[in-house]
């Protein structure tokens, strides 16, 4: 209804919403890392080799390409170091960079893991996303309580380490 004052600007608002939510830079990932000083550094301590490092509850949000509705939640990253580290805030920057497009949670999980591997040499990398999908809330089954969890483990798979990581999530 183009005569309704509340709806007149809705098409423009929708356009601006999608434009803002998917505002991805023209930089490719390597350029993005260079511009934002995202690089791994070798630890001076030999104790950093084989140490397990975990980051929990890193917020993430994106738009699902199936229904064009947001999904949001947390990312959990754990890795076994090969003597290299990455500044903790850099993980959030990588997640934000990769989530600024229409995607699926499964694809985003895979991309976060593979892109971290491009700049951080590790023995094992484990990435988990736990997200709420708006499509589950506002359409179909209208479930307010469900979350979707996606997980990926790259490189050496150590069940003991995975079990240790999982009890913290």
Predicted regions and their residues:
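A domain-level signal for the structural core that forms small-molecule/cofactor-binding pockets
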Residues: 1-169
